[in-house]
Design a protein with these regions (language model features):
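Nucleotidyl polymerases of mobile genetic elements and RNA viruses
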Residues: 1-176
Length: 176
């Protein structure tokens, strides 16, 4: 939050909210004495989504830096006024879009590992998928091995929605 220029007072408030929680449990229907909880966010904490957004902002900055230095080439969307999209994020779900190249695979791995080191968050590679459109299966397997993830196929689930045929064809039409 310092690097994002949050005022000292805001940082103190957030630290106070995150670090001073107490709890009590019911034992045989009677509450115990209150005890302090460990530091950090707890499941269901209303601040969690907002603090997570601050944390993953670092990923956006890393992706932007890799793209600005031509180390990562995102996917071009549109014909008349094309836009290059490198990633989409919502809450703790991220989809990374790129053209097929070993340079992109290496940059993707470097970005994700660097993000882990800088943020303290962990990327769940075992639940991550590499999905290709009109890309040779053996290339995908090799690339997924480098990324330490699984190969996915269309349809796949993103944000709880099954992305199938017409949606994927609409979004990725120029690759089909």
């Amino acid at each position: 939050m310092i690097k994002m220029r949050f005022p000292t007072l805001w940082r103190k408030w957030i630290t106070e909210c995150v670090g001073t929680a107490i709890a009590s449990v019911l034992v045989n229907g009677s509450p115990t004495d209150e005890f302090p909880l460990g530091k950090g966010l707890r499941q269901g904490d209303p601040l969690s989504p907002f603090l997570f957004l601050l944390a993953v902002e670092g990923f956006r900055v890393l992706m932007e830096a890799f793209a600005a230095n031509n180390l990562f080439i995102g996917y071009t969307v549109g014909c008349h006024d094309p836009v290059v999209v490198s990633h989409l994020q919502f809450a703790d779900d991220t989809i990374i879009l790129c053209e097929k190249s070993w340079a992109n695979i290496r940059a993707m791995r470097a970005t994700l590992l660097l993000f882990e080191d800088l943020s303290g968050l962990k990327v769940n590679f075992s639940q991550s998928l590499l999905v290709g459109i009109n890309i040779n299966g053996s290339w995908l397997v090799e690339a997924a091995t480098v990324l330490n993830c699984k190969v996915g196929t269309i349809p796949f689930i993103y944000l709880g929605c099954l992305l199938v045929g017409i949606l994927v064809a609409w979004f990725f039409g120029s690759l089909l």
